[in-house]
Amino acid sequence: MAKLTTEELLAAFEELTLIELSEFIKAFEEKFDVTAAAPVAVAAAGGAAGGAEAAAAEEKDEFDVILEAAGDKKIGVIKEVRALTSLGLKEAKDLVDGAPKPILEGVNKETAEKAKEQLEGAGATVTLK
């Protein structure tokens, strides 16, 4: 098997859907017995006091947009999920049907709030973490 360069690997990952990439990460974690979770989150959760936690929340610059429920207008929510993530119809429907699920991960505050507004406008229940 030929060794792939970093650029070739990144090009291959760019072609994957969000769901395919998530499945790859899970398989990678299982194969090599590692986790993709940020070690900072463990340290912050373990020793943070109430005041320190509030200060950390204000400084947070990466957010996850979590779809809690699709609501009554599932078709509109699926359309918004597709627009935000570039997923195909089936992948977006599966993601919406499997709520609660993350729609976007590690995005800036402005992008997260805009996505939340669009999804809520379509009838979804959304949280930012």
Swiss-Prot record:
The keyword Ribonucleoprotein applies. Keywords: Ribonucleoprotein, Ribosomal protein. Belongs to the bacterial ribosomal protein bL12 family. The lineage of its organism: Bacteria, Bacillati, Actinomycetota, Actinomycetes, Micrococcales. It comes from the Bacteria. GO terms for cellular component: cytosolic large ribosomal subunit. Forms part of the ribosomal stalk which helps the ribosome interact with GTP-bound translation factors. Is thus essential for accurate translation. It comes from Micrococcus luteus (strain ATCC 4698 / DSM 20030 / JCM 1464 / CCM 169 / CCUG 5858 / IAM 1056 / NBRC 3333 / NCIMB 9278 / NCTC 2665 / VKM Ac-2230) (Micrococcus lysodeikticus). InterPro entries: Ribosomal_bL12, Ribosomal_bL12_C, Ribosomal_bL12_C/ClpS-like, Ribosomal_bL12_oligo, Ribosomal_bL12_oligo_N_sf. Homodimer. Part of the ribosomal stalk of the 50S ribosomal subunit. Forms a multimeric L10(L12)X complex, where L10 forms an elongated spine to which 2 to 4 L12 dimers bind in a sequential fashion. Binds GTP-bound translation factors. GO terms for biological process: translation. This is Large ribosomal subunit protein bL12. One of its GO terms (molecular function) is mRNA binding. The keyword Ion transport does not apply.
